[in-house]
Amino acid sequence: MRPLSEKVAGIAPSATIEISNRAKKMQREGIDVISLSIGEPDFDTPKHITNACIDALNRGETHYAPSNGIPELLSAISDKITKENKFPCTPGQVIVTCGAKDAIYEGMEAVINPGDEVLLLTPAWVSYEPCVQMAGGKIVKHAVNQNTFQLDDSILERVNARTKMIVINSPSNPSGAVFDKKSMKLVADLCQDFDLYAMSDEIYEKMVYGKEHISLAGIGDMAERTITINGFSKAYAMTGWRLGYAVAPAAIIKEMSKVQQHSVSQATTFAMWGAVEALNGDQRCVEEMRAEFDRRRKFVISELNLMGYKTAPADGAFYAFVKVAGDDMAIATKWLEEGHVAATPGSAFYAPGWIRLSYATSMDRLKEALQRIKRVGGN
């Protein structure tokens, strides 16, 4: 038979999903594995959101909807962006997608031409590079400062005539770092000075602890060249709903819409009604989940530091990024096989020598996991 696609063959499987699947296999074999490897809140979706979805099903909201999203959700998103993220947004600048990952992929397809370079700040989430590759682009990596996890002027050395876009993620997966005003202004100045597009992944914006979340598009005229990525999975514990969105200039949204129309068509109609309630309804659930994540964060970071591990500034998201002595892949494997704790090696995020732990699980399980890590060792 003829060979399959070389483009897809060159893309590595998701390391985070691979580790999670391995842990689940051990669990099916009867082994008590504590999984700290996947970025998913352990809370159920709040009832007022699920009830809105059930109501939509009961009234027959089971048909095709506009490809970019139902008008009610587009309006709710544009209102939220204007009010909370502090840059003007109209419904015509929004597209609702099948998860934030889909928004990232569509955004890359809309902007990137074959041979274009995309500047990626590392450590970085595993799926940005494959999305760039599928769009025909090439990733150029730039490591943030390994002590502060902020940016400095050395990033200028990575820009050339082929650079088309920069991707940022604040709060960061995997490090939990939140970019400060200086770092964000540096990105904005870089884009304006070199005429670059920006993709700002802000999916963890509600999980910030004692810091300020800054939207890149709210700086100067950056809204004219920024694709802001967000969704409902993290803030509202709606991972399985597969609902994300992008906010961008109307010309970019038009191109993203073409990709969506000829692939997934639209996000699920009745699920979008749940998202309307998520944005327009009671927001106390978001703060309650954030407060619980903060409680776990303080405990996990404190315990790891007491064991002698260095950790990245955990000011956002729900991850502890841990510096280990030696091969992170080998240590993560040791933790899994000997301690039955699943964690993700930093090499998956272009950060060898680090390991990511998710504290999106119960306090009892976190306490047990840390005891196992302490027993097995690795620092």
Where are these regions (language model features)?
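Glycine-/proline-rich flexible loop or hinge segments
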Residues: D32-G39, A56-G60
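Substrate/cofactor-recognition hotspot
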Residues: V8
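Glycine-rich phosphate-binding segment of PLP-dependent enzymes
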Residues: T45-Y64, S78, K83
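Acidic/polar N-terminal loop/beta-strand segments that form early-domain functional surfaces
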Residues: I38-P41, S67
